[in-house]
C-alpha cells in the first residue's frame, strides 16, 4: 500500500553529524521509503538490529516502562519489545 505523503521519508531530512547508531536507522528508513522492491533481507535485518540496539540502550540507562516505574534489572529483562509495545496499553 502507498504511504500517505506527509509520512514519506525524504532524503534531504538527514543530519550530517548523526551518531553511528542512528545512521543505520536512517539508511534503513530510506530503503523502506523506496518501496517493497527495495525491502531486502539486509534492510529488514538492519532495521531489527537498530530497534534492538535502541531498546538495549534505553534499558541500560534505566528508561521508564511508560507507567512511571524504572527498570530495576535491565540486563535481566529479555522482553525489550514487549515493554515498548505495551506502553499506553495499560
Swiss-Prot record:
One of its GO terms (cellular component) is extracellular region. Its main location: secreted. Disulfide bonds: none annotated. GO terms for molecular function: peptidase inhibitor activity. It is found in: Secreted. GO terms for biological process: suppression of blood coagulation in another organism. Keywords: Protease inhibitor, Secreted. Potent anticoagulant inhibiting the amidolytic activity of factor Xa (F10) (Ki=4nM) and reducing its ability to activate prothrombin (F2) in the prothrombinase complex (EC(50)=40nM). This is Leech factor Xa inhibitor. It comes from Haementeria depressa (Leech).
Amino acid at each position: 500500500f502507498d504511504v500517505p505523503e506527509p509520512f514519506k521519508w525524504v532524503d534531504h531530512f538527514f543530519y550530517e553529524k548523526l551518531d553511528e547508531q542512528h545512521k543505520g536507522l536512517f539508511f534503513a528508513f530510506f530503503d523502506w521509503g523506496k518501496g517493497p522492491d527495495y525491502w531486502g533481507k539486509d534492510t529488514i535485518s538492519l532495521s531489527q538490529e537498530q530497534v534492538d540496539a535502541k531498546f538495549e540502550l534505553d534499558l541500560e540507562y534505566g528508561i521508564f516502562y511508560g507507567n512511571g516505574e524504572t527498570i530495576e534489572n535491565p540486563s535481566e529483562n529479555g522482553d525489550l519489545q514487549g515493554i515498548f509495545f505495551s506502553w499506553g496499553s495499560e
